[in-house]
Amino acid sequence: MSGDGGKSSKALTLVLLALVAASFSVAMYFQALNLMRTAGTSTTTSTASSVLTSTSPAATTRPWGSVTLSGAGASFLAPQMFEWSRALTETVGLRVEYQSVGSGAGRDMFFNKVVHFAGSDPPLSRELHEQYAGGVMQLPVVVGSVVIVYNIPEVPEGRSICLSSDVMALIYRGEIRYWDDQRILDVNPDLRGVLPHQEIVAVHRSDSSGTTSVLTAYLNKASPEVWSKGLVGFTVDWPVDAVGRGVGGKGNEGVTQVVKTTPYSLGYVELSYAITQRLPTAALRNAEGVCVKPTDQTVLNAVRNSTAFLPQSPLDDWSNVLPQMLNPPGRDSYPIVSFSYIFIYRVYPDRAVVEALREFIRWINTEGQERMVPGYLPITEEVRRVNLKAIELLEVGGT
């Protein structure tokens, strides 16, 4: 009996160990599955392609072989690019890695041929377009908006501040110091007694930024007497820094985090970041004098009401498009709307890279436009047709 009891005890032990091992394997399976689902949400470099390659077609069946496309640039574009990277690997087996380093740094990496393509909010200036004429193609791939996020504990959820371009310019010039300044209250009479007598912390980008270029171009267009052309660009000597009330953050990610953790601050980011971090966004007084919140509809209204003349080739000069998109007419138009662009060369020495770029361009202008991250809108059909011309323009050559 004791021998049988010992055998039974051992058998029971083995069964229990097997159950534990099975439970561990199941747990590891679901952990791995969760990692696969969440891959690509990094705010620096998408890793989705490395996780999902097993689901893609064999490399030998693809004209681009095992090439991985590399890109860098606008953090404005990054959340959408990470989603596209994940989906491209999953659906067609094309690996795309994107670094969210800011438009300025991304341009530098592109022109130094460190990466295959760049992401940028503003298009090339006329001078740069002339310098690279016939050699660089510009493709607007999403419609986005720059929004003002803020952290004012006294403003209850469900209520929103409104800011005019003059007020924003004066805040970043350091000339409006407190949240209860009369010039802010004039735009927000319903918040009299709510907005506190607290100093405004003006958060801005610390890196070379396309988002900064878009915001400052808007301020100069809407309030030229307050915000001069000398304060427009990728990097700005912020007057508010000189009076000790300005704080820099790297990337849209950095600005978002500074505002989120700093009471009585405000900053500017792409709408997707505000949505993800659940930060309140200000309504902006538009060209018709109406306070408008950033929504899909008000951004779409801005695009439709824009007077921008669209070039007919990716090789054309796009430098006039952004100024014409900012502060458009229309009572329901949101005033700070922009394309975000991808820059690619017309000629690459590696045929596999050219084939990969052709598929990349085809996909993001077709299937990719149906996979928009909240905070972005698809490009128009007219823009899509122009972008697709780049597929035929790409060539193999050079060294």
Predicted regions and their residues:
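Hydrophobic core
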Residues: 18-24
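Flexible loop/hinge segments at secondary-structure junctions
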Residues: 11-17, 29-38, 52-53, 57-399
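N-terminal Lys/Arg-rich, disordered targeting/topogenic segments
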Residues: 1-8
